Amino acid sequence: MEFYQNEKMTFSEHFSELFKIIRLSALGVVMASIFLSFYIDDILGNWLESLSLDADNFVFSVYSPYDWIDTKWALLLIFSIAMILPYTTYKIRNFALPGLYDKEKKWFTLSLLFSGVIIPILLYLIWFIALPFLVNYFDEVGMVEGGNNIVSARYDAVSIISLGIGVSWILVIGTLTTLVLSMSRFFGMVTDNESRIRIRILLICFSLVLLSLPSTYDGLRIIISLLTVLFADSISRLTPIFE
């Protein structure tokens, strides 16, 4: 009986260590958001100015101040998660590694490496390469010319930034959902695709994507949410099972 109590206490302490990692990560996201809040206006201003559009023929406008505030807070949260994610995945790796076999350690490390390192890199590519390229491309395609004069164009800054926010949330939520589902299968919590945990994870993913997408994606929210869930579930089924 004493042995059982010791084992139970050991498991409790082990679980408490995992909860501590999650708690510190959440605190890190809050602190990073507070820090970035002092610079978010400058970051957005410099990013908009970095778009290689003809300065004489375009104007950025904000048609809804409240949407602009929501946009800034969404960006703060996305950037904060990207900053803290490497720390979180590193701590989780150190937490779980002692209880895994060598083959399991390799897969586990690669999965966390993808989530903790690749996501921030992809977010950088989206915001500083892909999105500016698309904005500049569609600006050139859609520019209206009248005689020798080019008609001045106005761009809604919130709508442009919201495009990147939507893609960022899809990437972050979809990748983390895939990771959680893969870990559930990896540790035997999901067998033959039958598990309440799997269904709950998919429902949470669907709800998060549906609620986090900006108004720019109205009309596509449900479709995008379903595709994200289906993609995450399909990729997680590739998880190797070591016996």
Predicted regions and their residues:
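Membrane topogenic/interface segments and analogous intrinsically disordered interaction regions
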Residues: 1-243
